[in-house]
């Protein structure tokens, strides 16, 4: 059975989390996770750091799929603009690497991982550890990125279940 490697991204203007998983059928295996920390650089340098970080992850791990948290309405317009810029350069790095973009709303991610769209960060972190059989602590932003990747894995598994099997064609009397 083929392995599909997914790179999940939790974008941020100060910290961008990443999570990499392998999917084989219904099995999901942890590969790596972490954070691209952006310190106190000016915004253009932060954006360049995000772009380079994502590009390097793609070069090192060779994912076949890319998933990112979709934009949400933020109370602070300035923060929303910065988050949009961070997402934009992450998406740009993925597209330039030949990956298609898969976006998931925060509520959908929480629903897929925890079972309820209103889950908090601690619940998401806990379920990510359980689903990926991890013992040690996972950084919050990295756990969120792994949750994005897990959500995409569930989406791919659902699509695979909906495809008609080749044998269905023959069983249903379609052979001539």
Swiss-Prot record:
Q: Where in the cell is it found?
A: Cytoplasm
Where is the signal peptide, in residue numbers? Answer: none
**What does the record give as cofactor?**
Mg(2+)
GO MF term list: crossover junction DNA endonuclease activity; DNA binding; magnesium ion binding
Stored SUPFAM superfamilies: Ribonuclease H-like
Biological process terms in GO annotation: DNA recombination; DNA repair
Q: Which reaction does it catalyse?
A: Endonucleolytic cleavage at a junction such as a reciprocal single-stranded crossover between two homologous DNA duplexes (Holliday junction)
Q: Which residues bind Mg(2+) 1?
A: 10, 141
Look up the domain of life of the source: Bacteria
Q: Pfam families, from UniProt? A: RuvC
Q: Which UniProt keywords apply?
A: Cytoplasm, DNA damage, DNA recombination, DNA repair, DNA-binding, Endonuclease, Hydrolase, Magnesium, Metal-binding, Nuclease
* Stated role: The RuvA-RuvB-RuvC complex processes Holliday junction (HJ) DNA during genetic recombination and DNA repair. Endonuclease that resolves HJ intermediates. Cleaves cruciform DNA by making single-stranded nicks across the HJ at symmetrical positions within the homologous arms, yielding a 5'-phosphate and a 3'-hydroxyl group; requires a central core of homology in the junction. The consensus cleavage sequence is 5'-(A/T)TT(C/G)-3'. Cleavage occurs on the 3'-side of the TT dinucleotide at the point of strand exchange.
Which protein family is it in? Belongs to the RuvC family.
In its UniProt entry, what is this protein called?
A: Crossover junction endodeoxyribonuclease RuvC
Q: Which species is listed as the source?
A: Dichelobacter nodosus (strain VCS1703A)
């Amino acid at each position: 059975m083929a392995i599909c490697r997914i790179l999940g991204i939790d974008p941020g203007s100060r910290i961008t989390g990443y999570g990499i998983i392998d999917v084989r059928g219904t099995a999901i295996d942890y590969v790596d996770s972490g954070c691209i920390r952006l310190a106190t650089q000016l915004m253009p340098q932060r954006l360049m750091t995000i772009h380079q970080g994502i590009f390097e992850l793609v070069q090192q791990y060779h994912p076949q799929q890319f998933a990112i948290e979709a934009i949400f309405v933020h109370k602070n317009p300035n923060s929303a603009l910065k988050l949009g810029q961070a997402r934009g350069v992450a998406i740009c790095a993925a597209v330039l690497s030949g990956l298609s973009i898969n976006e998931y709303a925060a509520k959908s991610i929480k629903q897929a991982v925890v079972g309820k769209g209103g889950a908090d960060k601690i619940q998401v972190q806990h379920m990510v550890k359980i689903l990926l059989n991890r013992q040690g602590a996972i950084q919050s932003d990295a756990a969120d990125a792994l949750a994005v990747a897990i959500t995409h894995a569930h989406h791919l598994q659902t699509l695979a279940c909906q495809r008609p099997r080749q044998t269905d064609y023959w069983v249903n009397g379609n052979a001539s």
